[in-house]
Amino acid sequence: MTSTSDTKVCKNQGGLLEIKMEEECKYTTRQDRNLQKNTYNRDVFRKYFRQFCYQETSGPREALSRLRELCRQWLRPDLNSKEQILELLVLEQFLTILPGELQAWVQEQNPESVEEVVTVLEDLERELDELGYRASVQTEEQVTFQEVKPLATEQKPSVSLQFVKAKPGCELAGREAQEEQVSGVETGNEPRNVTLKQGLWEGTEAEQNPASRLAKDALECEEAHNPGEESSGISHEDSQPLRNENGVNSPANSEYAKHQSICPGRKVHGCDECGKSFTQHSRLIEHKRVHTGDRPYKCEVCGKTFRWRTVLIRHKVVHTGEKPYKCNECGRAFGQWSALNQHQRLHSGEKHYHCNECGKAFCQKAGLFHHLKSHRRNRPYQCLQCNKSFNRRSTLSQHQGVHTGAKPYECNDCGKAFVYNSSLATHQETHHKEKPFTQSGPIQQQRNHTKEKPYKCSVCGKAFIQKISLIEHEQIHTGERPYKCAEGGKAFIQMSELTEH
C-alpha cells in the first residue's frame, strides 16, 4: 500500500479540484452500504478462522482444508494485494496487543487501517496531556495512573502510553466486563492514598472525554473492589461518601454510591429510545447521537458534520486530494479503501449485484441500476394498482382482472370463470380427462388429442391442425394484410395482432 508521504497531492487550478473531489465524494457515498457489508463479512470470517475448533472436523485433512478456506475468505487474496493482506494482519495484531479499555475504545471508532488506529491513540494522548496525568498501561491489561509533577510555566505537560508493571488486584474494564486497577498516586517519590477530589469528574465534557473516562473508571473500579482494605492502598476514609473541604457531600457522591451498589461490569446505563445498555455513562452519551442526530465533528472546509472523529479524518482526504490507496493492476489511486475495493472487482470479474428480472450480474451497483431501466423501457404498460409493468396492453388488461375481480373466461362444462385464458385452458384439460372423445365425436376435437396436423404449407412445410390456421400462415409468404385498423389505418396479417394493436 502506498504511504501518504509518497502520494502526489494535486493542486487546485481554476476550481477543477473541487469538482473532481465532489464527484469522488458522491461516488464513495454510494458505496457506504457495500463497504459496511464487506467489512462485516471480513470480520466474521476472521473470527471463524481464529476460533476454529479441531473437534468439529472428521480429521486433520478436513481441518486443514477448512482453515485454508476461512483464511481465504478473510484475507481475499483474489482481491487484495500482498501489501493489503499484510496491512490486515498488522491491524489485527495491533488491536490485539492493546489493553482492554483502549482496545474497546479504538474498535468503537471502526478503523480501517493501522494509520487510523495510531491517529485515535495520538488524539487520546493529547487529551491525557490536557488532564495532566501520565497513563502507563501494562500488556496484561492492567493500568496505572501516576500524577505528573507540576512543571514550570514555560514547560508543557507531556504524556505517553507506556508499558510498565502495575500492581495486581483488579482487571482492566472493557467490552467483556473486565475491570481496571489503579496504583497509588505519587507526588514526587512518595506514595500516598488515593482520594477523589471534588469537581474532578464534573461536567458533561469530562464524561465524553476518553482520557478522563479511562482514569475515572479505573479509580471507581479500585474503590468498588477494595472499599475498606488497608492493603489496597486506600484507607477506610476513602471508602466513605465523598465530601468537600466544608464537609458537604460531593456532587460525585451519588455516582460513587451507585457504582458501589452494583457488581463491576454491569450495564446499568440504559438508552430510553432502544433499550440498549452500557457499562459507562459516556458510552451512553455517544450512543444517543444515533437517535438525536448530533454530529459534533465538523469539517472546516465544506462544513459537513460527522458523529465520529475517525470518519471526519477519512473525509478530509477528499479536500486534500490525497490518494494513498493504489490499484496494483492498473495503477489508479483512490482516496478511500472502499473505493479501491469496489474498483478491484472490475479486474477480478466478481459480480455481486444480480438482476431479479433476467439474472444478469454486475460488478457495480450503478451498472445494475442502468440495466434495470432497460426492463422498464421494454414494458411501457404499467398497472396503476400495483405498479407492475407489461410489454403488451392485452396482458395488462388481463392482469387488471386480478384487482377488479373480473373473470371473463368461463368454462362451458361447469361454468367456472377465470381471469386468464391460459387458466381456463388448463382447467378444461381436467374435463377432457374425465370425458375422453370417442370416434363419434367432433373430428377437430379428436385432432387436438392426437396432435394430427393434416394441413401443410407448400412453401415452408409447416403443418397445422385447422385449415384457417394454414390460410393465416400463408399470408406471411404472400405479404397480404387483410386486417386493418379503422383509426390509424395500420394493417396486420392476423386478427390477434389487430386486437393487440
UniProtKB/Swiss-Prot annotation:
It comes from Mus musculus (Mouse). One of its GO terms (molecular function) is zinc ion binding. GO terms for cellular component: nucleus. It comes from the Eukaryota. Residues 51-132 form the SCAN box domain. May be involved in transcriptional regulation. A zinc finger (C2H2-type) spans 269-291, 297-319, 325-347, 353-375, 381-403, 409-431, 455-477, 483-501. This is Zinc finger and SCAN domain-containing protein 12.
